[in-house]
Amino acid sequence: MIKIYDTMSRDLREFVPIEDGKIKMYVCGPTVYNYIHVGNARSTVAFDTIRRYFEYRGYKVAYISNFTDVDDKIINRAREEGITPQEVADKYIAAFREDVTALGVKPATRHPRVVEFMADIIRFVEDLIEKGFAYESQGDVYFRVEKSHNYAKLANKTLEDLDLGASGRTDEETARKENTVDFALWKSSKPGEISWDSPWGPGRPGWHIECSVMSTEILGDTIDIHGGGADLEFPHHTNEIAQSEAKTGKAFANYWMHNGFVNIDNVKMSKSLGNFITVHDALKTLDGQVLRFFFATQHYRKPINFTEKAVRDAETNLKYLKNTYEQPFTGNVDAQELQNFKDKFVAAMDEDFNAANGITVVFEMAKWINSGNYDASVKQALADMLEIFGIVFVEEVLDAEIEDLIQKRQEARANRDFATADQIRDQLVTQGIKLLDTKDGVRWTRD
C-alpha cells in the first residue's frame, strides 16, 4: 500500500487512484529563460523517481510536465540576448532536455508549452468572468480571491495573514484591483512586448492560469497528483487551486506533493549569495548519474545539502554498486532471500517514496550479492531497483586483448605459474582493470 504525504492535509494518506491501475500526474516544469539550477533538477529528479516507482508497482502513468515559455523573465532575457522570446524559450528548452537526459530523467508523457494553449487560456478566463470569479480592469483580468472557498489552505494561510508582496505587486497594479490579494489571470501588454489578441485587448496570460489550463485540457478537471517544489505552494499552486475549482466546481488534484530545497554548504542557494549552481555547470565536473544518485540520499521532502564531500561520497557509493552489478552472476539463486530484499525495498518506497531508505535496502542487497555467487535473476532484481532512481549501468565489453589476458592469467594460475599470473595482473592494472580472485572465480572491475 503506497502512502503519500499530502501537503493539503499535512498527513500521510493511502494512495487511491481515480481509476484503478492508472495515474494522472502533473508536475510544474521550468520557466525557460536560463539553464536549470540544481534546485530545479532536484524537483525534476524527485518526481521522475516517483513516476518510475509507480510504474515499477504496475501503474500506467500519464506524466505531464510543462514548459513555461511565456513570462516576463523570458521577455527580459530576449532583450539582453538580442533575440526573440521564442528563440530564448527554444534555446533553454533544448538545454533542459540535454541536462535532464544526463540525469537519467525519462521524457514526460507530454511536455506542453503555454503558446500551444493560448485560445484555451482565453476561454478559461472568459468562463471565470461569466461565473463572477474574475473581472476586467484596464485591460487586465484579475481573480476575485475573496470568492474562493478556503483560499490558501494549501499553504496553511488565511486572507488575513497573506504576504501582500508574494506576487510582486506594484502600486499601479494594486490600484486596478478590487482587493489587494486578487491575482492576475491576464495582463495587458506594453508597447513592443509579445502579446496575443483577447476580448480585453492585447496581452498575455498570468503565470498561474497557464498550468491550470494545460493540466485540465490534457488530463481533465481532476487529477491524481500535482507536484512541484516547496516554493510553489504559495502563491502558484494556491492560485491554481482557486481558479481551477472555481471554473469546474471539482477538486483540482487529490494529492499535493512538494519537494524540499537544495542548500549549498548549509546555506540556502541564491543568486545574490553567489552560490547558485546550474546543472549545465555541475555536469562539467560531475557525471550525471552521480548527481542523480546524490539526490536519492535524502527523502524528497527534506532539504538536501550540496557539498563536495556529499557528492564525492555519492560517487564512491555508486561505483561500489556498479562493481557489484558487473559481477558474473553465474551461481544459484536464493529465492527466499531475494524475495525478502524485494519486499523490504517495496516497504521502504511505499512509505512516501522514501528513496533514502530504499537505497539502504539496495546496499544491503549488494553486500549479500558480494558475499556469494548468484544467478541472473538477482542481477535483474538489482537492476530493476536501481532503474527507479534513474541509475542504469551499461555493461562494459572488454576488448579481445584484455579478455585474452584474463584467460591466460587463469591458465597460468591453474598451472601454478604465479610469476606469469602476477605479471599479467600488473599489466591489466595499467589498463585500468582490477581483478578480484574469489572462491567462485575471477571478478573484475574497471578503476
Residue ranges and their predicted role:
Residues 67-71, 93-96, 106-121, 139-148:
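Short, glycine/charge-rich beta-strand/loop segments that flank catalytic centers
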Residues 9-14, 18-106, 437, 444:
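N-terminal, positively charged nucleic-acid-binding surface of large information/translation enzymes
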Residues 1-31, 48, 118-327:
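Alpha-helical recognition segments enriched in aromatics with Gly/Pro capping
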Residues 97-119, 123, 233, 288-290, ...:
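Non-catalytic interaction-recognition regions
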Residues 268-447:
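Structural preference for alpha-helix termini/caps and helix-kink/transition segments
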Residues 59, 133, 433:
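Short phosphate-binding/catalytic loops that engage adenosine nucleotides
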